[in-house]
Amino acid sequence: MINRRDFLQTSALGAGAMALFGTSAYAAELQEADELPSEILSLRSRVEEAPPPISESERDERRERAQSLMDEHGIDALFIEPGASLTYFAGLRWGRSERTFGLLLPRRGDAVVVCPAFERERAAKQVDGRFEIRTWEEDESPFALIGDLMRSWGTGSGRLAFDEATRHFIVHGVSRDAPSLELVSGDPVTHGCRGRRTA
């Protein structure tokens, strides 16, 4: 029996194939009819000129740069929710929901992914062994988990920064469940990294 996800994927692929086939057939008809200007007909594909994908070593350098900026600004850790910054620093693409998911990057050491327990397997496929994954159950607080991780790094009363795209309920939850932390803006770190080109 086909499940909903497989059905949607198959439908999307079929629709995409039909759209491509229809477009290709239409373009061929126009080309045969000499209705396209010569400038259009002379265009060539530039796929081979596309820049290479971001390597993991480059992402390592980005995280190291972030840690250097954290040191400079007295920030002990940076929490990054799903979005452009999570992709930039970790190569992770994750949809947002009401359940907290993100990357906790300490000033020194390796980043940790904070993830709902039921999503662990899916997260592990993307993480691919690059980061430790720490999970929280439905009856537990992800914000307390963030505080616990900070304590395990010896920064239980340190400064925790948030990426500018972090939603209010997460910042509020951490302030409630890990009150010993000082919560600050992560802009000096994220802007300091993302505001400069590395390639």
Each language-model region and where it sits:
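N-terminal secretory signal peptides and thylakoid transit peptides that target proteins
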Residues: 1-15
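Flexible, acidic/His-enriched mid-domain "rim/lid" segments that flank
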Residues: 12-16, 21, 29-46, 58, ...
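Mature N-terminal segment immediately following signal peptide/propeptide cleavage
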Residues: 53-81
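Glycine-rich loop at the start of a catalytic domain that most often binds anionic cofactors/ligands
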Residues: 88-100, 104
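A general structural motif
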Residues: 100, 110, 155-159
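Short internal beta-strands
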Residues: 102-106, 112-116
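Short acidic-hydrophobic, aromatic-tinged amphipathic segments that line or gate anion-handling sites
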Residues: 132-139
